[in-house]
Amino acid sequence: MMSILQESHQIIRQTYKGVMKILLVIVICILPTIIFATNSFYTSALNGFNDENFEKAIKYLEKDIVFNPKSSESYILLGKSYEGIDDQNNALKYYEIAFTLIPHNLELNYLIGKVSYELGLIEQYAEQISNLEILCETSCEEIVKLKDLAE
């Protein structure tokens, strides 16, 4: 009886080792493809943005954030692309997502403040000025540009 259990255990171990080797090979083969694809999405989006083809940039950035949900650069570029097609609401949405990832970014605080001002969200605009006053030890370009919007 004991030998049957030992044989079964040995067969299971060998099968498990074989399956794990196959899975390891699959992961090693697929992972570089996924990494290349995500870099390719962002690069294609950046090219589209630089060519002022904002719809193309949006298409690729939406794919990129599926693979890189913590890429603040992708969310910021997505916001700028939506601004490029005059969709301030979506621009603000993506800037706010990026803000959850990097709240200390001066440019991002400026962009949120600018779009908030354009949408008439004066409280949010004032909040971004306050954020920039905290982040900028002395006067910085972002706070000057943001305050100039109201003049």
What are these regions (language model features)?
Residues 50-51, 84, 118, 149:
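Register position in tetratricopeptide repeats
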Residues 64, 97-98, 131-132:
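Canonical positions in the second alpha-helix
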Residues 38, 72-73, 106-107, 140:
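Helix-start (N-cap) detector for alpha-helical repeat units in TPR-like alpha-solenoids
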Residues 67, 101, 135-138:
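Structural marker of alpha-solenoid helical repeat scaffolds
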